[in-house]
Amino acid sequence: ARERMDEEELEAFYNCVRIIVKNKHLLKSDVRNVYEEQLD
């Protein structure tokens, strides 16, 4: 699939991945907080 993407799309894709990886711990704690609020 990588050959079909142009460089701009590839860059956008890697930026998305980088942001997700960087914010993974934040995502996990947000999800946990949402569930804890629902349980109260």
From Swiss-Prot:
Q: Does the keyword Transferase apply?
A: yes
Q: Name one GO molecular function term.
A: ATP hydrolysis activity
Tell me the keywords, alphabetical order.
Answer: ATP-binding, Helicase, Hydrolase, Multifunctional enzyme, Nucleotide-binding, Nucleotidyltransferase, RNA-directed RNA polymerase, Transferase, Viral RNA replication
Where do transmembrane segments lie in this chain?
Answer: none
Q: Which reaction does it catalyse?
A: RNA(n) + a ribonucleoside 5'-triphosphate = RNA(n+1) + diphosphate; ATP + H2O = ADP + phosphate + H(+)
EC number(s) per entry: 2.7.7.48, 3.6.4.13
Q: Which family does it belong to?
A: Belongs to the potexviruses/carlaviruses RNA replication protein family.
- Protein task: RNA replication. The central part of this protein possibly functions as an ATP-binding helicase.
Protein name in UniProt: RNA replication protein
